[in-house]
C-alpha cells in the first residue's frame, strides 16, 4: 500500500498550528521552510499539491501581544484577520524559492454544505492546479460563527481531498503516528496500519496535541481519515518532522487503507459535508424500509418533526431511539410536515392535491449513516 503513496500524482497535505508556530504563537520560519521544501520537491516531480494549513489565529497572537490562544470568538477572529495575511505571505515567499505561485482559498462550513458553493470551490481549486499554482486552503476564521464552523482543519482537509479527487491525504501534526494510548505512557505503541474500524477496537483515541495553540486532536484526525478512506483515498498520519519520509513511502506514521468501494460524489457530500437542519423521527416500519430496503421516506412513516428547514435542506432520519440512520434532502418545508404525518400518499393526493403525492425524502437523495 505504501506504493500508492509514492505513486500519488495529486496530494493533499494538512498541517496543524502546532507544527508551524513557536511556543509563543508566532510563525516558526524554519518549520515553514522545511514543509515548503518538501512540498516543492513534490511539485518538481510533476505532482500536484494542495496544502490545507491551520495557523492564521496562531500567527496573529504575537503581533497582537497575546500569549495564548484566546477563548472568545471575537478575539480569535481578530487574531485570524492579522495572522492570515502573515501566514499566506510567508508561504508565498517560501514557495517562490521553488518558482511556485500560491493561491489562497478561504472556506467556511457554508461553502461546503451548500451544493452550489461546493461545486464552485471545486472549480476554483481545479483551475489553480491547472495553472500549476499551489492552493493553500484554510477555514475563513474571520467570518465563521461559533455555531457553524469546522473548528479544526482535519475535517476540512478530508472534504477538500474528496473534492479535488486526490490520490493521497497526509495529516501532519506534532505526533508521529496514531498510538494505542497516550504516547507518553509506558505500554503505548504506534499503530503502523489501519485497515478498517476493527483495527481501532480498544484503542484509546484522545488528546488535543502538545502545544496548546491548535484546536485539533487525534479524535478529529481519525475522523478525517475515516471520511477520506470512505471515499477511496489512502491517508497517512504522522508528524511534520517526518513529512518528507512519509511522502517518500517510508514506513513512518500510520497508514489508513482506503475503502475498495467509492460512493457517488453527491452522496459523499450529503453524508459528510452537509449539516442537518432538522430531524425526522421514523416509526419501525419506515426505518426498515429506508435502511434495509433503501426505499424513499413517505409521510406515513414519520412520527415527529424537529427543526426549522425548507424544502431542499439536509435532514437526519432517526430511529425510535433518536439515533440517526440516514440523511437526506427533504422535499417539504418544516411547517408543512406536521399535518402530513401518518397519512398515505394516496390520501394526501385526494385531500390536498397531486403535489402532495411526492416523497418526503426520495431514495436518490438519501444516504445511510
UniProtKB/Swiss-Prot annotation:
CDD domains: AAK_G5K_ProB, PUA_G5K. Keywords: Amino-acid biosynthesis, ATP-binding, Cytoplasm, Kinase, Nucleotide-binding, Proline biosynthesis, Transferase. One of its GO terms (cellular component) is cytosol. Gene3D superfamilies: Acetylglutamate kinase-like (3.40.1160.10), PUA domain (2.30.130.10). The keyword Cell inner membrane does not apply. Substrate binds at residues 54, 141, 153. Residues 277-355 form the PUA domain. GO terms for biological process: L-proline biosynthetic process. Pfam families: AA_kinase, PUA. Catalyzes the transfer of a phosphate group to glutamate to form L-glutamate 5-phosphate. Belongs to the glutamate 5-kinase family. This is Glutamate 5-kinase.
